[in-house]
Amino acid sequence: MLITKKIRLKPTTEQEILFRKSAGVSRWAYNFFLGENERIYREYIDNGKVGKKSISEGDVRKYINNILKPTTHSWLKEVGSNVMKQGVKDASLALQRYFKGLSGKPKFKSKHKDRPSFYVNYESLSRKQGGFQGEKIGF
């Protein structure tokens, strides 16, 4: 059974810039979700434990797509939509694991200390003559 396949990429300068932007968007989405959850929880405690205790992954994605992307955060459009979606999903999963007692409290990702990475959905990749075609990235 084939579980993973490792490939070596030789990106052009433009593609390398897009990879770095994708890693930055993923980190930003992860940190944004954690920050929003902390803010909502603080409001919940300050209001005498009345209202929402946390915010859902779907609500944050809708807020980013409908409010932030068209106005102040237009740079989010430069990378594939799955990159931002996966960053939010990873943060949501980290919080769920924390609340179940399976892991420690999730920390904000640092631009300089953490290894830049992002997830690419394998379904969005297709093999082409001499390379691969991905969401907003082609070889």
Please report, for each region that a protein language model flagged, where it lies by residue.
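Nucleic-acid substrate recognition interfaces
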Residues: 1-139
